[in-house]
Amino acid sequence: MSSGRGSRIPEYWYGQVPVPPFMRFMEVIYAGAVSLRRLAYRRGWRRRYGVAVPVVVIGNLVAGGTGKTPLTIEIVARLREAGWTPGIASRGYGRRDLKTPRWIQPDTPIELAGDEPAMIAWKTGMRVRVDVDRSAAACALVAEGCDIVVCDDGLQHYRLMRDIEIEVIDGQRRYGNGHLLPAGPLREPMVRGRLCDFRVLNAGQYSDRPTSGFGPGDWQMRLHIDHAQSLQGSRRRSLDAFSGQRVHAVAGIAHPERFFSMLRQRGIGVVPHAFPDHHFYRAEDFTFGSRLPVLMTEKDAVKCRAFADDWFFSVPLRVELPTVFWTALFDRLERLVSC
């Protein structure tokens, strides 16, 4: 049984439950506000800001996570290998002082950084700037010598001009019931995705079988797990070492069951503990009543290093995308810089 502490998503978003009439009414109001906002930027009534380097925005149309941050980390790593100096812009959701722009280092306190920016800084070692104004964050990154800006989230932040948009879609949940907030999970209508340069479908763990519902413009992303990293020291263990054992599995992400399922597929006996997305952990959260190894996502691990002991392990995700995706992305970037 799960600990039951995960964030609550309305059943009608992804289930067969009818949408309450009041939520349908609120959806109409929300849809009008979204349309007016986009119109204001298209007509120039609201100003947009650009920078002198390419800007890549990675985002999604639904509320909640879809796998943007692992893809952001992989894209940043590929850019570095190709000789770029990427900087990452983020809103820093979940940090306690959203109004203050901040540079994020691997050792920045989590309450000041936010969990996703902290994880990006920890994994990439690159410049990370958090600011509710992504355009201001982009300017700060360029001033520090970055020659490309990667935005973790921000598809709806039209104030920042962008060169490439990448939409990330949960390959299992897709767009839910297809309704806009609050009647459904959509921040914008589904047709908005057609305007993006790339659409990446997070199909979860590797499978030789094709995932249904993929269109010709979709790129399939697969996530792999193969080892666990101790939060104390550099000890690394293959996940095969946990096969046949029971572990406490911790996930404070938008879709905890995906992480639990990936562990089960490795033959691990999962005692699941789902926490709300962006949850700030305390040592008391881990009073589970039994002494078992604790396996968690990297996003959770960055918030537990201060009190973790030798029984705490993070499970890194490895992203796989077709070679042709990377070729298409870098060809697009080369065309941008050669113009």
From Swiss-Prot:
Documented EC number(s): 2.7.1.130
Pfam families: LpxK
Keywords carried by this UniProt record: ATP-binding, Kinase, Lipid A biosynthesis, Lipid biosynthesis, Lipid metabolism, Nucleotide-binding, Transferase
Residues binding ATP, per UniProt: 62-69
UniProt-recorded Gene Ontology molecular function terms: ATP binding; tetraacyldisaccharide 4'-kinase activity
SUPFAM superfamilies: P-loop containing nucleoside triphosphate hydrolases
UniProt keyword Aminoacyl-tRNA synthetase present: no
Gene Ontology terms: biological process: lipid A biosynthetic process; lipopolysaccharide core region biosynthetic process
Keyword Protein biosynthesis annotated: no
GO CC annotation, single: plasma membrane
Known catalytic reactions: a lipid A disaccharide + ATP = a lipid IVA + ADP + H(+)
Taxonomic superkingdom: Bacteria
Pathway per the UniProt entry: Glycolipid biosynthesis; lipid IV(A) biosynthesis; lipid IV(A) from (3R)-3-hydroxytetradecanoyl-[acyl-carrier-protein] and UDP-N-acetyl-alpha-D-glucosamine: step 6/6
NCBIfam families: lpxK
Family assignment from sequence similarity: Belongs to the LpxK family.
Function: Transfers the gamma-phosphate of ATP to the 4'-position of a tetraacyldisaccharide 1-phosphate intermediate (termed DS-1-P) to form tetraacyldisaccharide 1,4'-bis-phosphate (lipid IVA).
The protein's name in its UniProt record: Tetraacyldisaccharide 4'-kinase
Originating species: Xylella fastidiosa (strain M12)
